[in-house]
Swiss-Prot record:
This is Pro-interleukin-16. CDD domains: PDZ6_PDZD2-PDZ3_hPro-IL-16-like (cd06762), PDZ7_PDZD2-PDZ4_hPro-IL-16-like (cd06763). Residues 404-500 are annotated as: Interaction with PPP1R12A, PPP1R12B and PPP1R12C. Residues 129-143 have a biased composition (Low complexity). The keyword Iron does not apply. The modification Phosphoserine is found at S220. One of its GO terms (cellular component) is cytoplasm. Residues 410-495, 532-617 form the PDZ domain.
Length: 630
């Protein structure tokens, strides 16, 4: 049966290529002109005469000793085989050369080494050189895919063999490996050649250093070959220059950290220059308090963890007078002995004025208040003489009105354990209605409650040397959490008084200060009457809603009645009216409380009669407001 294709029966719409026809042609099985699978397989005379009509056997190539059967097949009249024929012998020799090059890290030998007496090495080196030139692209692809460590010395050796300065150093290596290369065509040459590389790398640098630098410069080909030039003494200089650059890069982020912290929490007096002329007094107070807290915190961080052991060497810094040195020693030792059990102590900034009168005079007026003098000496003893003199010079410049406000500023130092809280919470922030950051709540069993200086409603100026002026609420909470880590905490607080409130409003917002001043003028002109009212507490409450309070939308306002609910007992009795200020509720003062805290007090009351003290304005301001509304 004939399996050959009939040319007349072909489909005109489907074209069959010649290679597919040859696959099914019976001539393929009889065609002797195919290339042999084995390069050294001998051809019979009968096959040779069939493949060649002239009767001449195929000639051998003098270079590689393989029969050129594929050339005679092109000349024959027989149909050619498919294009996927077996690979010729020269390609197999090139594959052997690639394997030898992968196992040999020394790369190509010098062309001048062809005059060697061994004929066998000449036969194998010839195809190897040709294979390296023709298959360099394949070698690069294979090295790119593998990224093995054995390929890196191969590239480095190839780079070295092309340089004229490295030719002299590579010649003795090529002569030494020339005889061995002819006999070791497989992978057996790898164990004898690879261990020799670290011996040459060690004089210029350790192998660990080269492995650490290679990934950093392996992105581009020219820099990637530089680490392997360590085998030559001339190539080690540029590599050693890379070391200081790497160290500079590693030290870069470390040097930037203090600057970032300084920018995020400014502690210097640069803030006083940015404020307005009306805010000079408050800015001076902020700068002085920040300097005191930062100086005290800096000295505490320089001391050991135990403060009792560290206060004694700080006393000679302050003790400038021989007459007061004994008193300071006893005071500091007394505070040092109680530091383990005591929660802390505080210093009023007004005590700095006493040091302006003279550092050499002993103050006998403070003997009556020995505890405050003792705590003041303990805090001031932590400051160095330069910092103390600088603070004294700034205090001398202040006027009398500003010096009076120093009485309300306290520097409190709390002794605690690592990870313990300070015992109070914060309220307010630059992003909230209440711009000033104040103490929201003092916990009953906390450190601040045991020490006694920090009270609810006090303004917090700084914590551990970090100023809270102009910070947001989240930033203030982050500073408060950071104060858990050290064993000591330095908190600068300011007691808010009626005189200091307008100053605070002017520093935060000029519009808010203007509205506050207008409200004060209205309240002063209007006459107010105080009433005592008894209401019935039900499950729904007292029957009215509140507005105002500390930290409200319009600032710190008194708690007033906003709206009276319909159907409540208070509506029927008409004892209270919208706008009445609540002064006292069931014996609890309502001044300085937020609206949320006032509601918590109302919810905690039992059901029954509740006594409320309210303050109601006269009818004259109400009539004016009604006329203005109309």
């Amino acid at each position: 049966m004939d399996y050959s294709f009939d040319t007349t029966a072909e489909d005109p719409w489907v074209r069959i290529s010649d290679c597919i026809k040859n696959l099914f042609s019976p001539i393929m099985s009889e065609n002797p002109g195919h290339m042999p699978l084995q390069p050294n397989a001998s051809l019979s005379e009968e096959d040779g005469t069939q493949g060649h009509p002239d009767g001449n056997p195929p000639k051998l190539d003098t270079a590689n000793g393989t029969p050129k059967v594929y050339k005679s097949a092109d000349r024959s009249t027989v149909k050619k085989g498919p294009p996927v024929a077996p690979k010729p012998a020269w390609f197999r020799q090139s594959l052997k050369g690639l394997r030898n090059r992968a196992s040999d890290p020394r790369g190509l030998p010098d062309p001048a080494l062809s005059t060697q007496p061994a004929p066998a090495s000449r036969e194998h080196l010839g195809p190897h050189i040709r294979a390296s030139s023709s298959s360099s692209i394949k070698q690069r692809i294979s090295s790119f895919e593998t990224f093995g460590s054995s390929q890196l010395p191969d590239k480095g050796a190839q780079r070295l063999s092309l340089q004229p300065s490295s030719g002299e150093a590579a010649k003795p290596l090529g002569k030494h490996e020339g005889g061995r290369f002819s006999g070791l065509l497989g992978r057996g040459a790898a164990p004898t050649l690879v261990p020799q590389q670290p011996e040459q790398v060690l004089p210029s640098g350790s192998p660990a250093a080269t492995e650490a630098r290679d990934p950093g410069v392996s992105e581009s080909p020219p820099p990637g070959l530089q680490p392997n030039q360590k085998t030559l003494p001339t190539g080690s200089d540029p590599l050693l220059r890379l070391l200081p650059t790497q160290t500079e890069k590693s030290q870069g982020p470390v040097l930037k950290m203090p600057s970032q912290r300084a920018r995020s929490f400014p502690l210097t007096r640069s803030q006083s220059c940015e404020t307005k002329l009306l805010d000079e007094k408050t800015s001076k107070l902020y700068s002085i308090s920040s300097q005191v807290s930062s100086a005290v915190m800096k000295s505490l961080l320089c001391l050991p963890s135990s403060l009792s052991c560290a206060q004694t060497p700080c006393i000679p810094k302050e003790g400038a007078s021989p007459t007061s040195s004994s008193n300071e020693d006893s005071a500091a030792n007394g505070s040092a002995e109680t530091s383990a059990s005591d929660t802390g102590f505080s210093l009023n900034l007004s005590e700095l004025r006493e040091y302006t009168e003279g550092l050499t005079e002993a103050k006998e007026d403070d003997d009556g208040d020995h505890s405050s003098h003792q705590s003041g000496q303990s805090v001031i003893s932590l400051l160095s003489s330069e910092e103390l003199k600088q603070l004294i010079e700034e205090v001398k410049v202040l006027d009398e009105a500003t010096l009076k406000q120093l009485d309300s500023i306290h520097v409190t130092i709390l002794h605690k354990e690592e990870g313990a809280g300070l015992g109070f919470s914060l309220a307010g922030g630059a992003d909230l209605e209440n711009k000033v950051i104040t103490v929201h709540k003092v916990f009953p069993n906390g450190l601040a409650s045991q020490e006694g200086t920090i009270q609810k409603g006090n303004e917090v100026l700084s914590i551990n040397g970090k100023s809270l002026k102009g910070t947001t609420h989240n930033d203030a909470l982050a500073i408060l959490r950071q104060a858990r880590e050290p064993r000591q905490a330095v908190i600068v607080t300011r007691k808010l008084t009626a005189e200091s409130m307008p100053d605070l409003n002017s520093t935060t917002d000029s519009a808010a200060s203007a509205s506050a001043a207008s409200d004060v003028s209205v309240e002063s002109s209007a006459e107010a009457t105080v009433y005592t009212v008894t209401l019935e507490k039900m499950s729904a409450g007292l029957g009215f809603s509140l507005e105002g309070g500390k930290g409200s939308l319009h600032g710190d306002k008194p708690l007033t009645i906003n709206r009276i609910f319909k159907g409540a007992a208070s509506e029927q009795s008409e004892t209270i009216q919208p706008g009445d200020e609540i002064l006292q509720l069931a014996g609890t003062a309502m001044q300085g409380l937020t609206r949320f805290e006032a509601w918590n007090i109302i919810k905690a009351l039992p059901d029954g009669p509740v006594t409320i003290v309210i303050r109601r304005k006269s009818l004259q301001p109400k009539e004016t407001t009604a006329a203005a509304d109309s």
